[in-house]
């Protein structure tokens, strides 16, 4: 789910010299109060998170990834989406910087991600990779809830990016 805070979709094509440069990622990683040191040991590290997100970027981005527990996940989902339960990933997309840099926060609720991975028979690593790619696409304006065509486009991008990263199709 994407929460747009005055955000416009990131430009996908540009005919200037900047379009020839690879998108750059300025990444911060945070941990909510509920994330114990034992849980942190099981989470992907910053370098791996960046390796998963970078192929999903079509513009430079300044992103914060925050890992949270059920309480914070529920509070955020209730406060911003009016749904009183934690969800796997929330994306907060903000207005792009003047240079077009995408700015956003990706919040992943660890207990929900772990439960889904177990229920779906997926490796936890693969599920985190999928949700980070999914969230990065949301931060750039992609949306799967506006139309079937948009959902198909976003899913196809996710499947392609994850395949390049060595992960199977998350929708099968």
UniProtKB/Swiss-Prot annotation:
Biological process per Gene Ontology, one example term: rRNA processing
EC numbers for this chain: 3.1.-.-
GO cellular component: cytoplasm
InterPro entries the record matches: MetalPrtase_cat_dom_sf_prd, YbeY, YbeY_CS
Enzyme class: hydrolase
Compositionally biased residues, Basic and acidic residues: 10-21
Compartments where found: Cytoplasm
Positions contributing to Zn(2+) binding: 134, 138, 144
Main location: cytoplasm
Cofactor note: Binds 1 zinc ion.
Keywords from the UniProt entry: Cytoplasm, Endonuclease, Hydrolase, Metal-binding, Nuclease, Ribosome biogenesis, rRNA processing, Zinc
One example GO MF annotation: zinc ion binding
Cysteine pairs bridged by disulfides in the record: none
Region (Disordered): 1-21
Pfam families: YbeY
Cofactor(s) recorded in Swiss-Prot or TrEMBL: Zn(2+)
PANTHER family with a match to the protein in the record: ENDORIBONUCLEASE YBEY, CHLOROPLASTIC (PTHR46986:SF1)
HAMAP family: Endoribonucl_YbeY (MF_00009)
Similarity comment: Belongs to the endoribonuclease YbeY family.
NCBIfam families: PRK13963.1, rRNA maturation RNase YbeY
Described purpose of this protein according to its UniProt entry: Single strand-specific metallo-endoribonuclease involved in late-stage 70S ribosome quality control and in maturation of the 3' terminus of the 16S rRNA.
Protein's name according to its UniProt entry: Endoribonuclease YbeY
């Amino acid at each position: 789910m994407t929460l747009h805070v005055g955000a416009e979709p990131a430009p996908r094509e540009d005919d200037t010299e900047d379009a020839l440069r690879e998108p750059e990622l300025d990444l911060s990683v945070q941990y909510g109060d509920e994330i114990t040191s034992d849980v942190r040991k099981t989470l992907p590290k910053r370098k791996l998170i960046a390796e998963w997100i970078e192929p999903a970027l079509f513009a430079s981005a300044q992103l914060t990834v925050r890992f949270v527990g059920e309480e914070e996940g529920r509070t955020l989902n209730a406060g911003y989406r009016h749904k009183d339960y934690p969800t796997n990933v929330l994306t907060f997309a903000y207005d792009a910087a003047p240079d077009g840099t995408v700015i956003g926060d990706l919040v992943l609720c660890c207990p929900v991600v772990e439960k889904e991975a177990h229920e779906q028979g997926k490796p936890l690593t693969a599920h985190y990779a999928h949700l980070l790619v999914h969230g990065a696409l949301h931060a750039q304006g992609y949306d799967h809830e506006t139309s079937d065509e948009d959902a198909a486009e976003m899913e196809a991008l996710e499947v392609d990016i994850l395949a390049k990263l060595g992960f199977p199709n998350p929708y099968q």
